[in-house]
A protein has these predicted regions:
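Mixed-charge, low-complexity intrinsically disordered regions
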Residues: 1-68
Length: 68
């Protein structure tokens, strides 16, 4: 299981990656919030750096990675 911390503080669990049907070149990341809500966003956005408090930081930073 992989867990990521969003730059605003939320913790999310990686569910899977998927190919967008309408454009097979786009990899979508599927992830779950602590309250169970499922979210998805393009991999290019999930893994990008954003500006936060004057610094470039990852949108999602890996905080836990384990093999089940």
């Amino acid at each position: 299981m992989k867990k990521y911390k969003h730059f605003k503080g939320g913790i999310y669990e990686w569910v899977c990656s998927a190919t967008l049907e309408s454009d097979p070149n786009i990899q979508m990341i599927v992830y779950r919030a602590a309250n169970g809500t499922i979210w998805t966003r393009p991999g290019s956005v999930f893994f990008e750096e954003v500006e936060h408090q004057g610094q470039k930081v990852p949108r999602f930073a890996l905080i836990e990675s384990s093999i089940n």
